[in-house]
Amino acid sequence: MSFARFPFWRVAPSEREGEFILPVMPPATVGPEGAPHVMGGVALAAAVDALELASGQTLLWSNIQFLAPTTHAEELLVSCEQCGGGQSVGQWLAEIRSNGRVTHRVNAALGAREPSEQRLFSARPDVPAPDDCTPGDRGWGVPGTLGDQLDIRIAHEDEERGMQALWSRSQAGFKADSGWLAIVSDFFLGAHPATRGGSSLDDTFRFIQGCDDGWVLSVTEFAAFDRGVVHGSAKHFSQDGRLLAISSQSGVLPRIPRTP
């Protein structure tokens, strides 16, 4: 097992204003040997990083559409443009390309209306602590890819109700910031046996706050399987119970379900 010491979703500015480059490293990828591709959540995290750099503000929400594969991509080019907003909150667009082809489109809002008082209404469910849970399967690719970057523990599963509670953290000790939580938000299709091997269509990610301790509890609830597509949502909590983020997603179910 090998894991990245540097946040593998961080982008670097290009020579053009509002344009950023993500050098694709193995930890950013999933897939079988010989056919790695950038995990959708990593692409979202790269877009979030680029948008925060371009705007100088913190993400509020984003929605990404997964348009085309990124197999064997060596770098992703992220272009950011403000399209609206006021003095406190800006509305932005981002487009991600690989070898000139558009692979993702992102809508987002960034900023804050201050002063403001935080109130959290969603409460973390009572589940076993990470040390008391069964380790999860990280077999998402060959050694050195995204699966090696994660420590995963299954806190609760109910296939009949379409629910899962999953603890996860970075093996390298990365903070659960907006970028890392964007990656975590795309674990959606792994939360039910019938969805594994499917293809995400989108990911809507709402960022509340980050945390330093690393462990994140993702509580996923599937709403429906319909017309070959799954719909659902998730809430992401810190170990001390604070709400960190909210996400929702739709994905195409696999034609042939994977065997457990």
Stretches with model-predicted labels:
Residues 1-260:
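Terminal targeting signals and extreme-terminal segments of soluble enzymes
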